[in-house]
Design a protein with these regions (language model features):
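Short, well-ordered amphipathic alpha-helices
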Residues: 69-75, 86, 103-110, 181-187
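Inter-lobe connector of SF1/SF2 helicase motors
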Residues: 1-61, 72-75
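Soluble or luminal CAZymes and related metallo-dependent hydrolases
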Residues: 6-10, 36, 61-69, 98, ...
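Coupling/switch/interface segments within P-loop NTPase motor domains and analogous charged loops
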Residues: 15, 61, 65, 71-79, ...
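Conserved strand-helix element at the start of the C-terminal RecA-like helicase core
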Residues: 5, 28-40, 82-104
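Short, solvent-exposed loop/turn segments at secondary-structure junctions
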Residues: 9-12, 46-54, 92-96, 127-128, ...
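Short helix-terminating capping/connector loops at secondary-structure junctions
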Residues: 30-33, 80-85, 115-118, 191-194
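Conserved RecA-like P-loop NTPase helicase motor core
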Residues: 111, 115-195
């Protein structure tokens, strides 16, 4: 189901700014090496994900995709504790790195809501085949209840759907084939959520 979030004041202002940038590019008023539609599209996608990705001076906002995702994940987590059902959060922008990133932000927020750190994992931390196998096995067993990863890291070819109850796309993948990884056979839980 779709989780609709109203635009924040900062996002509205930023969208006005990038609309002006797009018009300048269309009119040829700016060199393509300075600004272009690809940069504008990327900045728009980052802003839609979390305004802090385009303006680091902003504070945490509840009125964002990340804030809503964290609320949804926590609600589902506690509602499905008995069966140890699992969730995937897909995020292609702002993957784990030093400094501010969405993955660490989500993890901190989930921990603050009472989800144990050892039940939250980043697919990016499994940097060998052995670690990937162990991580995915832990997700299938319900030891890891929330896994965050990019479409590339945990999309096509990754089979962790056994206990999967929800998928959360906080940014949209470029390829339609990358959506809907939860709809598989041989699952413990048949009624699932995709947000």
């Amino acid at each position: 189901k779709d989780a609709l979030i109203s635009k924040s004041y900062d996002l509205k202002k930023y969208l006005e700014e990038i609309s002006k940038r797009a018009e300048a590019v269309r009119m040829g008023a700016v060199l393509r090496t300075v600004d272009n539609m690809l940069k504008i599209t990327t900045d728009g996608r980052k802003a839609a994900l979390d305004m802090r990705l385009v303006d680091s001076s902003l504070s945490v906002g509840c009125q964002s995709k990340v804030g809503r995702c964290v609320e949804n994940v926590a609600n589902i987590y506690f509602r499905t504790m008995k069966d140890r059902l699992t969730q995937v959060i897909f995020c292609d922008y702002s993957t784990p790195k030093k400094g501010f990133n969405i993955y660490d932000d989500i993890k901190v927020r989930l921990k603050n809501l009472g989800i144990p750190e050892n039940e939250i994992a980043f697919a990016h931390s499994a940097n060998t085949e052995k670690k990937r196998k162990q991580l995915f096995d832990d997700v299938r067993k319900g030891k890891i209840r929330v896994i965050l990863g990019s479409t590339f890291k945990i999309g096509m070819g990754v089979n962790i759907q056994d206990r999967l109850i929800a998928l959360h796309y906080i940014d949209v993948p470029w390829r339609p084939a990358d959506v809907g990884r939860i709809l598989r056979t041989f699952k413990i839980k048949k009624n699932v959520e995709v947000t």
